[in-house]
Design a protein with these regions (language model features):
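PLP-dependent amino-acid enzyme catalytic core
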Residues: 1-142
Length: 142
């Protein structure tokens, strides 16, 4: 979300009681690089980024890294998956009453897809390769 400051005050107040990783439709408003860096009840602020010191990079130019930790699920892939499914829903190309969303990946993309699908009320299938960590499978089973 490019301009979270445009979200109504009533919705922002409601979000104060919703955790960043909760399965709650209001967390669709948190698909943003500008989430306040707190796990419970946050609102918005500056872009979540950090300047990597020149002592580490070895170059004179500023190198800035974006921080995905403060997205729902702790991974920025919720943005990528929302960007895939939202246009299909809006244009009618995807009908959640008769179609499942399928999210194949090695981890965060399918996690983001399953999460966003759930918030939108869409049934989904997350596909992980066999050798992935037990934690990823357990998270998806929830």
């Amino acid at each position: 979300m490019k301009n979270p400051e445009n979200i109504s005050g009533a919705i922002r107040d409601e979000m104060k009681s919703i955790g960043l990783w909760d399965m709650h439709p209001r967390n669709l408003y948190r698909v943003s690089w500008k989430n306040e860096p707190v796990s419970e009840g946050g609102n918005y602020g500056a872009v979540n980024a950090m300047v990597i010191p020149k002592e580490i990079t070895g170059v004179k130019a500023n190198i800035i890294g974006l921080v995905g930790k403060w997205f729902p699920t702790g991974a920025h892939k919720v943005g990528a998956t929302y960007g895939c499914i939202a246009p299909a829903l809006v244009t009618g190309q995807f009908d959640p009453s008769s179609t499942k969303a399928v999210w194949p990946s090695t981890g965060n993309y399918c996690r983001g897809g399953a999460y966003i699908s759930s918030l939108l009320g869409c049934e989904s299938v997350a596909i992980l390769p066999e050798g992935m960590s037990r934690e990823r499978f357990e998270w998806l089973q929830k």
